[in-house]
Amino acid sequence: MKIITEFKGTYINAKANTGKTGNTYYQMSIDCNGDAGSISCTEDVYNLCQSGAVERFHDYIFTGELNTQYGSFRIRDVREQ
């Protein structure tokens, strides 16, 4: 089952890492109410951040997806408040 949630936070940075098998993994750093952390994100969200459409240290609304089948959480959308 997939559960969708939205929250407000401050975008800090996004990065891509390539694993040993050649798969690329995308993550973004977000500050939410004074707690900062790194969260997985989709390639589309990563590309949006790299294009400059999402500015560092600005506040946004993030859409997250919890996938209970795989026990994963990732950001699947970012939009202006």
State each model region's role.
Residues 14, 33, 67-69:
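Short coil/turn motifs at secondary-structure junctions
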Residues 6-11, 57-66:
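OB-fold and OB-like beta-barrel modules that bind single-stranded nucleic acids
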Residues 2-22:
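Structural detector for short beta-strands of small beta-barrel domains
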Residues 65-81:
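OB-fold/S1-family single-stranded nucleic acid-binding modules
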Residues 2-6, 26, 37, 60, ...:
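Acidic, two-metal ion nucleic-acid-processing modules in DNA metabolism proteins
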Residues 45-63:
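Short nucleic-acid-contacting surface segments enriched for D/E, G, S/T with interspersed K/R
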Residues 19-43:
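OB-fold (S1/OB) nucleic-acid-binding surfaces
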Residues 42-48, 79-81:
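A short, sequence-level motif marking secondary-structure junctions
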